[in-house]
Amino acid sequence: MNASLNKKLGNVKWGDYKMGELFQRVKTNKLPYKADELPNQPLGEYTLPCLTSSFNNQGLNYYAPREGATILQNVISIPSNSDVYRAYYQPNDFTVLSDAYAIRWIFDDRELSSRQYLFMVMCINKVTDLPVYSYKNKLGGWNVVKNKHIQLPQKRGEIDFDFMESFIAELEAERVAELSAYLTVSGLDNYELSNNEMAIIERYKKHQIPFSEFEFIKIFNNIKQGRRLKKDDQLPGDI
Protein backbone atom coordinates (compact mmCIF):
# COMPACT_ATOMS: atom_id res chain seq x y z
CA MET A 1 0.00 0.00 0.00
CA ASN A 2 1.44 3.36 -1.00
CA ALA A 3 2.31 6.26 1.29
CA SER A 4 -0.79 8.22 0.28
CA LEU A 5 -3.16 5.49 1.43
CA ASN A 6 -1.23 4.92 4.65
CA LYS A 7 -1.42 8.64 5.35
CA LYS A 8 -5.19 8.60 4.81
CA LEU A 9 -5.59 5.79 7.32
CA GLY A 10 -3.42 7.67 9.78
CA ASN A 11 -5.30 10.95 9.44
CA VAL A 12 -8.89 9.71 9.53
CA LYS A 13 -10.82 9.73 12.80
CA TRP A 14 -11.89 6.30 14.03
CA GLY A 15 -14.93 5.27 16.06
CA ASP A 16 -15.66 2.15 18.10
CA TYR A 17 -18.65 0.03 17.03
CA LYS A 18 -20.14 -3.19 18.35
CA MET A 19 -20.56 -5.82 15.63
CA GLY A 20 -24.05 -6.83 16.76
CA GLU A 21 -25.24 -3.23 16.45
CA LEU A 22 -24.16 -3.07 12.79
CA PHE A 23 -24.81 -6.58 11.45
CA GLN A 24 -27.23 -9.43 11.95
CA ARG A 25 -26.82 -13.11 11.21
CA VAL A 26 -28.74 -14.38 8.20
CA LYS A 27 -30.97 -17.40 8.79
CA THR A 28 -30.47 -20.17 6.23
CA ASN A 29 -32.08 -23.51 5.46
CA LYS A 30 -30.09 -26.52 6.63
CA LEU A 31 -28.96 -28.52 3.62
CA PRO A 32 -29.25 -32.35 3.65
CA TYR A 33 -25.67 -32.83 2.44
CA LYS A 34 -22.19 -33.31 3.82
CA ALA A 35 -19.21 -31.68 2.13
CA ASP A 36 -17.71 -34.99 0.98
CA GLU A 37 -20.99 -35.82 -0.77
CA LEU A 38 -20.87 -32.74 -2.99
CA PRO A 39 -18.85 -32.04 -6.16
CA ASN A 40 -16.08 -29.46 -5.94
CA GLN A 41 -17.03 -28.03 -9.33
CA PRO A 42 -20.39 -27.25 -10.99
CA LEU A 43 -21.99 -30.47 -12.17
CA GLY A 44 -25.53 -30.84 -13.54
CA GLU A 45 -27.97 -29.27 -11.09
CA TYR A 46 -25.17 -28.81 -8.54
CA THR A 47 -24.36 -25.21 -9.49
CA LEU A 48 -24.75 -23.21 -6.25
CA PRO A 49 -21.47 -22.55 -4.36
CA CYS A 50 -21.57 -23.74 -0.73
CA LEU A 51 -19.86 -22.03 2.18
CA THR A 52 -17.82 -24.05 4.68
CA SER A 53 -15.14 -23.17 7.21
CA SER A 54 -12.33 -23.39 4.64
CA PHE A 55 -10.41 -20.19 3.87
CA ASN A 56 -9.54 -21.42 0.36
CA ASN A 57 -11.53 -19.78 -2.42
CA GLN A 58 -13.32 -17.61 0.18
CA GLY A 59 -14.80 -20.74 1.73
CA LEU A 60 -16.69 -21.71 -1.43
CA ASN A 61 -15.36 -25.12 -2.45
CA TYR A 62 -18.45 -27.26 -3.05
CA TYR A 63 -21.64 -27.05 -5.11
CA ALA A 64 -25.24 -27.95 -4.27
CA PRO A 65 -28.61 -27.77 -6.05
CA ARG A 66 -30.33 -24.40 -5.82
CA GLU A 67 -33.68 -25.97 -4.94
CA GLY A 68 -34.39 -25.75 -1.22
CA ALA A 69 -31.28 -23.67 -0.51
CA THR A 70 -31.20 -20.17 0.94
CA ILE A 71 -29.47 -18.16 -1.77
CA LEU A 72 -27.40 -15.26 -0.46
CA GLN A 73 -25.35 -12.47 -2.01
CA ASN A 74 -23.86 -9.14 -0.93
CA VAL A 75 -23.17 -10.38 2.60
CA ILE A 76 -20.13 -11.14 4.74
CA SER A 77 -19.20 -14.75 5.57
CA ILE A 78 -17.33 -15.83 8.70
CA PRO A 79 -16.20 -19.36 9.73
CA SER A 80 -17.54 -20.66 13.05
CA ASN A 81 -15.32 -23.73 13.39
CA SER A 82 -11.97 -23.32 11.69
CA ASP A 83 -8.24 -22.88 12.05
CA VAL A 84 -8.50 -19.45 10.41
CA TYR A 85 -11.40 -17.09 11.17
CA ARG A 86 -11.19 -14.87 8.13
CA ALA A 87 -14.22 -12.89 6.99
CA TYR A 88 -14.97 -12.43 3.28
CA TYR A 89 -17.31 -10.26 1.27
CA GLN A 90 -19.50 -12.51 -0.88
CA PRO A 91 -20.94 -10.52 -3.82
CA ASN A 92 -22.33 -13.48 -5.78
CA ASP A 93 -24.93 -16.19 -5.19
CA PHE A 94 -24.01 -18.87 -2.63
CA THR A 95 -25.49 -20.77 0.30
CA VAL A 96 -24.24 -21.91 3.70
CA LEU A 97 -23.37 -25.59 4.13
CA SER A 98 -21.60 -26.00 7.48
CA ASP A 99 -19.24 -24.52 10.09
CA ALA A 100 -19.78 -20.95 8.86
CA TYR A 101 -22.43 -18.26 8.69
CA ALA A 102 -23.30 -15.03 6.91
CA ILE A 103 -24.03 -11.57 8.30
CA ARG A 104 -25.81 -8.65 6.67
CA TRP A 105 -25.82 -4.89 7.27
CA ILE A 106 -28.61 -4.26 9.74
CA PHE A 107 -29.88 -0.86 8.57
CA ASP A 108 -32.52 -0.72 5.82
CA ASP A 109 -32.07 2.99 5.12
CA ARG A 110 -28.58 2.45 3.65
CA GLU A 111 -27.43 -0.27 1.29
CA LEU A 112 -23.69 -0.82 1.42
CA SER A 113 -21.72 -0.79 -1.80
CA SER A 114 -19.27 -3.58 -2.58
CA ARG A 115 -16.36 -1.28 -1.72
CA GLN A 116 -17.87 -0.37 1.64
CA TYR A 117 -18.40 -4.05 2.40
CA LEU A 118 -14.76 -4.74 1.46
CA PHE A 119 -13.56 -1.99 3.80
CA MET A 120 -15.66 -3.36 6.67
CA VAL A 121 -14.33 -6.87 6.07
CA MET A 122 -10.83 -5.45 6.47
CA CYS A 123 -11.87 -3.95 9.82
CA ILE A 124 -13.65 -7.12 10.98
CA ASN A 125 -10.59 -9.26 10.26
CA LYS A 126 -8.59 -7.13 12.67
CA VAL A 127 -10.58 -8.75 15.50
CA THR A 128 -11.37 -12.21 14.02
CA ASP A 129 -8.46 -13.23 11.77
CA LEU A 130 -5.87 -13.40 14.54
CA PRO A 131 -3.11 -15.99 15.17
CA VAL A 132 -4.44 -16.63 18.68
CA TYR A 133 -7.51 -18.40 17.25
CA SER A 134 -7.32 -21.98 15.96
CA TYR A 135 -9.10 -25.33 16.15
CA LYS A 136 -7.74 -25.69 19.68
CA ASN A 137 -8.64 -22.12 20.67
CA LYS A 138 -11.83 -21.39 18.77
CA LEU A 139 -13.12 -17.90 18.20
CA GLY A 140 -16.73 -19.08 18.42
CA GLY A 141 -19.80 -18.27 16.37
CA TRP A 142 -21.95 -15.18 15.98
CA ASN A 143 -22.95 -15.31 19.66
CA VAL A 144 -19.32 -14.36 20.39
CA VAL A 145 -18.47 -12.24 17.35
CA LYS A 146 -21.54 -10.00 17.73
CA ASN A 147 -20.03 -8.68 20.97
CA LYS A 148 -16.69 -7.85 19.36
CA HIS A 149 -15.90 -4.19 18.68
CA ILE A 150 -14.42 -2.90 15.44
CA GLN A 151 -12.95 0.46 14.45
CA LEU A 152 -14.56 2.33 11.54
CA PRO A 153 -13.77 5.77 10.05
CA GLN A 154 -15.90 8.61 11.38
CA LYS A 155 -16.91 12.06 10.20
CA ARG A 156 -18.87 14.40 12.47
CA GLY A 157 -19.67 11.50 14.76
CA GLU A 158 -21.11 9.28 12.01
CA ILE A 159 -19.62 6.38 10.03
CA ASP A 160 -17.75 7.88 7.08
CA PHE A 161 -19.02 5.75 4.19
CA ASP A 162 -17.53 8.13 1.61
CA PHE A 163 -14.06 7.55 3.06
CA MET A 164 -14.49 3.77 2.76
CA GLU A 165 -15.64 4.09 -0.85
CA SER A 166 -12.80 6.37 -1.94
CA PHE A 167 -10.15 4.39 -0.04
CA ILE A 168 -11.02 1.05 -1.66
CA ALA A 169 -11.36 2.72 -5.08
CA GLU A 170 -7.86 4.18 -4.73
CA LEU A 171 -6.50 0.85 -3.49
CA GLU A 172 -8.03 -0.93 -6.50
CA ALA A 173 -6.54 1.66 -8.87
CA GLU A 174 -3.13 1.19 -7.26
CA ARG A 175 -3.28 -2.59 -7.72
CA VAL A 176 -4.40 -2.27 -11.35
CA ALA A 177 -1.56 0.17 -12.05
CA GLU A 178 0.97 -2.22 -10.47
CA LEU A 179 -0.32 -5.11 -12.55
CA SER A 180 -0.33 -3.04 -15.73
CA ALA A 181 3.27 -1.96 -15.12
CA TYR A 182 4.34 -5.56 -14.48
CA LEU A 183 2.65 -6.81 -17.65
CA THR A 184 4.27 -4.05 -19.70
CA VAL A 185 7.77 -4.74 -18.35
CA SER A 186 7.28 -8.48 -18.84
CA GLY A 187 6.04 -8.04 -22.40
CA LEU A 188 2.67 -9.53 -21.46
CA ASP A 189 0.56 -6.43 -22.00
CA ASN A 190 -0.75 -7.68 -25.35
CA TYR A 191 -3.45 -9.91 -23.90
CA GLU A 192 -6.12 -9.64 -26.59
CA LEU A 193 -7.84 -13.01 -26.82
CA SER A 194 -8.36 -14.87 -30.06
CA ASN A 195 -11.83 -15.98 -31.11
CA ASN A 196 -10.92 -19.55 -30.19
CA GLU A 197 -9.75 -18.51 -26.70
CA MET A 198 -12.93 -16.50 -26.14
CA ALA A 199 -15.02 -19.49 -27.24
CA ILE A 200 -13.21 -21.73 -24.75
CA ILE A 201 -13.89 -19.25 -21.93
CA GLU A 202 -17.58 -19.17 -22.84
CA ARG A 203 -17.70 -22.97 -22.80
CA TYR A 204 -16.09 -22.95 -19.35
CA LYS A 205 -18.62 -20.41 -18.04
CA LYS A 206 -21.46 -22.61 -19.28
CA HIS A 207 -19.89 -25.69 -17.63
CA GLN A 208 -19.49 -27.37 -21.02
CA ILE A 209 -15.88 -28.44 -20.49
CA PRO A 210 -15.61 -31.89 -18.83
CA PHE A 211 -13.23 -32.40 -15.91
CA SER A 212 -11.77 -35.67 -14.63
CA GLU A 213 -9.72 -36.77 -11.64
CA PHE A 214 -6.13 -37.97 -12.07
CA GLU A 215 -3.57 -39.42 -9.70
CA PHE A 216 -0.49 -37.27 -9.14
CA ILE A 217 1.82 -40.14 -10.07
CA LYS A 218 0.21 -40.43 -13.52
CA ILE A 219 0.81 -36.75 -14.29
CA PHE A 220 4.03 -36.05 -12.40
CA ASN A 221 6.00 -39.26 -12.86
CA ASN A 222 9.27 -38.02 -11.39
CA ILE A 223 8.29 -37.10 -7.84
CA LYS A 224 11.29 -37.08 -5.50
CA GLN A 225 11.26 -36.80 -1.75
CA GLY A 226 13.73 -34.35 -0.27
CA ARG A 227 15.90 -34.97 2.75
CA ARG A 228 14.00 -34.58 5.99
CA LEU A 229 15.46 -31.83 8.14
CA LYS A 230 16.36 -32.60 11.73
CA LYS A 231 16.91 -30.41 14.75
CA ASP A 232 20.66 -30.58 14.13
CA ASP A 233 20.08 -28.75 10.83
CA GLN A 234 18.70 -25.68 12.61
CA LEU A 235 20.91 -22.63 12.98
CA PRO A 236 20.37 -19.74 15.41
CA GLY A 237 19.39 -16.43 13.88
CA ASP A 238 16.79 -13.71 13.49
CA ILE A 239 14.05 -13.64 10.86
State what each model feature region is.
Residues N147-K155:
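An amphipathic, hydrophobic-aromatic interaction surface with interspersed Lys/Arg
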Residues M1-N57, K155-I239:
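Non-catalytic DNA-recognition/assembly elements of restriction-modification systems
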Residues G20-N147, E215-I239:
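DNA target-recognition domains and sequence-specific DNA-contacting regions of bacterial/archaeal
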